[in-house]
Amino acid sequence: MLDKLLQKFRDQKKPVFHKEEGYWEISALRKWAAILIIAFGAGIIYIVPYFAFFQFKTAVANVTGVEPNRISLLLTAYGIVSLLFYIPGGWLADRISAKALFSVSMFGTGIITFWYFLVGLKGIVWITPN
């Protein structure tokens, strides 16, 4: 029974997608590169805020002068604000292209990650008053 069903799908000559001319005509290497970039970016978007606060809480507290308990409170506030913006973000995703939203979010994540990097260099590279 399963073989007949699979054979029926194999014998169909209709394409699954009604493709526009040239839309699906990109090389396999470019497809895999795009998938890799999207997967890496999606992972980084969720990891950066939590990784910086959980893994480097003591280092961030020492560099910024903020108590570790306050950093935990900031992480809680980040989670609540993120939760509140999920619904408007979904509404926005229905009206703006996914490529534009992904580009903006990756740019913002890059700026925040670079800021984390600069915070970590405070006192090592820059001469700061005591």
UniProtKB/Swiss-Prot annotation:
InterPro entries linked to this entry: MFS_trans_sf
Gene Ontology terms: cellular component: plasma membrane
Domain of life: Bacteria
Main location: membrane
Subcellular location: Cell membrane
Membrane-crossing residue ranges in chain numbering: 34-54, 73-93, 107-127
Membrane topology of the entry: Multi-pass membrane protein
Keywords assigned: Cell membrane, Membrane, Transmembrane, Transmembrane helix
Name assigned to this protein: Uncharacterized protein MPN_112
Species name: Mycoplasma pneumoniae (strain ATCC 29342 / M129 / Subtype 1) (Mycoplasmoides pneumoniae)
